[in-house]
Amino acid sequence: MSIMSYTGGTVLAMAGDGCVCIATDLRMGEQMTTIATDVKKIHKIGDRIYVGLCGFYSDALTVKNQILYRKSLYELRENRKMRPQVAAEMISNMLYNKRFGGYITEPLVAGLDPLTNKPYICAMDTIGCIASPRDFVAVGTGQEYFLGVCEGKLFYIILVRELPLELE
């Protein structure tokens, strides 16, 4: 059994035209054992930046506090709002610096660029390797299930959009 399954949880983010959606479950537990049903896994980092943290809950809270601390320092030094891409790079660097005794959490960043209003979503593994697809991303113990459902729905949406063009 993976270390990630001890407190479980899954976070999903989808990007649209000028919008992002981020969703999660509220349960914390291992397999059939439920510890809590009101656990917050999505945290607001900036005006338009959200971070979802799955995995070991105490590590997720530690990572969240470090993200908020580094975001405040960034905005003080740079005198501007943090962009989602910058937040993702910052989190990735933070996780990679602790790779040998790392945090047991998988972050997901979703947000809108404050200047261009373009959506940005990305997911990371426990050592900070960034995966930033255009349409959807998931992290956590239910990641495989969410990705399958999203791929099926996305294929259906693309098929419905393109099918009328082919019939004409």
Each language-model region and where it sits:
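Conserved short S/T/G-enriched processing/targeting/catalytic segments and their helical context
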Residues: 1-103, 128-168
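Acidic-glycine-rich active-site phosphate/pyrophosphate-binding loop
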Residues: 110-128
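Active-site rim beta-loop-alpha module in soluble metabolic enzymes
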Residues: 107
